[in-house]
């Protein structure tokens, strides 16, 4: 039986991962992931486990190489988007990324910011980032993304000082962007 679900998680990767694992516990295996759509087929309850990994900071070549590495380990891997494709033009600048990953387009990693990784459930926790250095690097990537948003909103707030309402709104958005920065820094401190 095929089951189709419409969901949008945005940047809430852990929520997406929990939902996919909940679906697996109910007896559904992911077969396709689109912008908003997830297609599942019936399977034994709890047969699969899922992990979601953020790869938007990688270049197209590095992302493809990482995907092939995971597939070589026996995992099934699906690309997934974070954004909905609502942008000006077909090129996006990612200041937090490395190397050629700073620029994404339809031909590179524009709608391939996440990897959904599936494995057979062996009863062990499923983690892709196992070493402390790996976890720190992963959390720093997320922290830096939100730090970039904070800096942009703070700068725009200063630019629009002549319009107090706009400046206050932009400043408030900047402060909101600091919440995940602090949360990821706390995670880094715990490691």
Tell me what each language-model feature is:
Residues 1-191:
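Terminus-proximal functional modules
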């Amino acid at each position: 039986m095929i089951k189709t679900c419409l969901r949008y998680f945005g940047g809430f990767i852990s929520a997406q991962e929990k939902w996919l694992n909940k679906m697996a516990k109910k007896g559904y295996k992911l077969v396709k992931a689109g912008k908003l759509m997830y297609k599942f087929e019936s399977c034994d309850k709890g047969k699969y486990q899922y992990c979601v990994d953020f790869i938007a900071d990688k270049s197209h070549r590095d992302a493809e190489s990482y995907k092939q590495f995971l597939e070589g380990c026996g995992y099934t891997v699906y690309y997934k988007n974070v954004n909905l494709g609502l942008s000006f033009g077909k090129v996006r600048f990612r200041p937090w990324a490395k190397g050629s990953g700073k620029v994404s387009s339809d031909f590179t990693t524009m709608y391939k910011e996440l990897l959904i990784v599936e494995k057979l459930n062996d009863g062990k926790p499923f983690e892709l980032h196992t070493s402390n250095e790996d976890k720190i690097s992963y959390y720093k990537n997320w922290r830096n993304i939100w730090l970039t948003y904070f800096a942009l909103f703070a700068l725009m707030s200063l630019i629009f000082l002549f319009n107090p309402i706009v400046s206050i709104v932009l400043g408030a958005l900047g402060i909101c962007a600091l919440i995940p920065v602090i949360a990821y820094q706390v995670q880094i401190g715990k490691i």
